[in-house]
Design a protein with these regions (language model features):
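Short, high-confidence coil segments that cap the C-terminus of an alpha-helix
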Residues: 40, 90, 120-121
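Histidine-centered beta-alpha loop that forms part of the nucleotide-sugar donor binding/catalytic region
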Residues: 9, 68, 97, 128-129
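Conserved core of the sugar-phosphate nucleotidyltransferase
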Residues: 79, 101-156
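Short phosphate-binding loop-to-helix
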Residues: 44, 50-94, 102-113
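N-terminal glycine-rich phosphate-binding loop and ensuing alpha1 helix
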Residues: 2-47
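Structural beta-sheet core signal
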Residues: 4-6, 45, 95, 123-126
Length: 156
């Protein structure tokens, strides 16, 4: 059965409690939960934070209590996934970052179709092309020519 993991650490250093920060009237984490619930009720939030846990439980979502050792600045998503797989029985799962409030559930469904369909993929990852322009310390363009820079809508 397909399950979704949302890793939601409480100890962000740059933006304290970022997963609970209000974004247009809702905690950031709520956007991810609502998107995932359009696909399945088998949504799990991994957290070490009591406030996040209480919020998740108030939404009737499964909580995986993350050990403190997996909630450090150097902890990786892979470590959290491994812990999730030790706790939850599943053959097919998806990781959704709570810091992507504009994620469309169709993107998740498209990825599931690639894995669960006739194609022989065992994993997929979503990416988006990022266009950045860089200047050196003297203000000289590094990866474009002044006066000859494409507008963002002109990129493929």
């Amino acid at each position: 059965m397909f399950k979704i993991l949302i890793p939601a650490r409480g100890g962000s250093k740059r933006i304290p409690k970022k997963n609970l920060v209000d974004v247009n009237g809702k905690p950031l984490l709520q956007y991810a939960i609502e998107t995932c619930r359009k696909i399945t009720d088998n949504v799990y939030v991994s957290t070490e934070d009591n406030e996040i846990q209480a919020f998740v439980e108030s939404m009737n979502v499964n909580v995986i209590e993350r050990p403190d050792r997996l909630a450090q600045d150097d902890s990786t998503t892979e470590d959290v996934v491994e812990h999730f797989l030790e706790e939850v029985d599943t053959d097919l799962f998806c990781v959704v970052q709570p810091t992507s409030p504009f994620l469309n559930f169709n993107s998740i469904l498209d990825g599931m179709e690639l894995i669960d369909g006739k194609l022989e993929y065992d994993s997929v990852i979503s990416v988006c092309k990022e266009i950045n322009y860089y200047w050196d310390i003297n203000g000289k363009p590094i990866n474009f020519e002044l006066g000859n820079r494409k507008r963002t809508q002109e990129h493929e």
